[in-house]
Structures are given as structure tokens and as C-alpha cells.
From Swiss-Prot:
NCBIfam families: hisG, HisG_C-term. GO terms for cellular component: cytoplasm. It holds the Pfam family HisG. It comes from the Bacteria. It is found in: Cytoplasm. Its cofactor is Mg(2+). It is an enzyme of class 2 (transferase). Pathway: Amino-acid biosynthesis; L-histidine biosynthesis; L-histidine from 5-phospho-alpha-D-ribose 1-diphosphate: step 1/9. The gene is hisG. One of its GO terms (molecular function) is ATP phosphoribosyltransferase activity. CDD domains: PBP2_HisGL2. GO terms for biological process: L-histidine biosynthetic process. This is ATP phosphoribosyltransferase. It comes from Pasteurella multocida (strain Pm70). Keywords: Amino-acid biosynthesis, ATP-binding, Cytoplasm, Glycosyltransferase, Histidine biosynthesis, Magnesium, Metal-binding, Nucleotide-binding, Transferase.
Amino acid sequence: MIESKRLRIAMQKSGRLSQESQALLKQCGVKINLQEQRLIAYAENMPIDILRVRDDDIPGLVFDGVVDLGIIGENVLEEEELTRQAAGETVNYKKLRRLDFGGCRLSIAIPQDEAYNGISDLKNARIATSYPNLLKRYMQQQGVDFKTCSLTGSVEVAPRAGLADAICDLVSSGATLEANGLKEVEIIYRSKSCLIQRAAELSPEKQALVDKLLTRIQGVQQAAESKYIMLHAPKEKLEEITALLPGVENPTILPLAHDNSKVAMHVVSQENLFWETMEQLKDAGASSILVLPIEKMMG
């Protein structure tokens, strides 16, 4: 296969993960015109091609070197890795960064009216799942024998349909489980999205572009986790007020016009500033407190 000079990134073609992946690239300054029916999109301002595919195809495309990067849920990534390893294949890739979206958990659930005293209750149970290898690894670690019922969709209906005693499926809010008369009893895996790279070495130009994207992603994620705080503080209360601000290193102190008793403080806080903290700041003597979102950060 001829090596493309453009960086190829695989991402999910539809759904929430697709939307969040698109938003991340946009925040990183990648201009892409994504049309609903097009499976390949081209960046307007960078040598980047976006391949929009099924999520469970993304790990294989990266493992096999068809694409350079992939944005994928860790649950899908590790399930495919375990599948290939079980078939005797060697899996090589680089996990570049965990991303701050796509969070979910892979859990075992049973009918709500059944008692549950621990994982040993599932001995010899038939468990329906779309993640047989992650489930098998967990149950082996727990020393519990079970039977697998592999399904590719609608896993939550398996107990009612008489196909299984329990299920192992992705859970976000738990509403789907409740709607199907199930309750969560074991969390076996916690997942977020991640950025992965093929193992084969990239050209210097491509690697430089990957490094640039990584720097921008780091800046986007740091900005999302940070707030820019401005306030007025009495000079004698600076130390007390600074101690109340979470994650602050070196505040910028500026004089105030026409008031020598106070200064202006500008700080970047690496943690969320809650109402309780703002009330504590006010009680300590701070005034004119502003908390602003940060769009981008670098350095």
C-alpha cells in the first residue's frame, strides 16, 4: 500500500463519540467539513484525512497500519486487543493520550428481584455480553466459572427473553438497566475515549503534525479543567484568600486605582470553583469575584 503523505485519523462515523471527537478536532484548530453521507473528510487547513467508520473497526485499522491515529473508547480498544491475542496475534500500537469524554463503565447486571451477595453468586451463570473477552478476564481474576452468551446488540433484554441469567454491558446513567428490570451488581471496567497511534514509525512530517495535535489537545483539556479567576482582595488577607483557591500556584497581583488598601488578583485555578468556595472568599474579604471559562491554554 502506498504511504499517504496526509495524516489519516479514524473516528466513529455517528453517535455521541463522533460528535465529541469532531468537537475536539475543531477546538484544536482543524477545519473539517463533515457531511452526513461522506465516509472520508479532508481538513481544509492541515494535511489530515478523517475516516468515519464503525467504532469496532477503529482498533484494527490502527493495529494494521491502515490509519495513523484513531479516537476510540478504551472498552472497544481493549476488547479487540484481547480478541486478537486470543487468536495468537501480536498487537502493537501506541496509546498517546486519554481523552476527557466518552466516559462509561462495563458492568454486570442481574434482574432486580434477585438477591446478590457477591461475585460467587454468578458461578455457572449464563451472562450475555458484547464484550466476552473483558468479561472472561474479569471472571478469571475473580476465580468464578461462567458461561458466555455473546450478543452484538440489545443485551439488556437477554434475561427477560430467557437467553441469560445476567448481562455485562456498558452503563452510563443506569436508566436503560432500570427500564429493563435490571440492577448493576459489579463494575468490571471503567472506560474513556483515547487517542491511539499505529506502531509503525511515521514520516518526520507526520510525526511533527501528531506532536502538534497532542500539544493542542493537552491545551484544550487543561482549559476545560481550569478557570480564570479575578477578584479584589485586601492586602492583609492575600495569604488567606490564596489558600482558599484550589490548584493555584502563582497569582498575579495588580494595584487598584484609587484604593491602596486592596489589590486585584488574577489566577488560573486547575480545579472547579464551587459556590461554597466563592462564599468563603467573600467572607475572607474578597470582592468583585469573577470566574471565567478558558478556551485554550499553552505553556
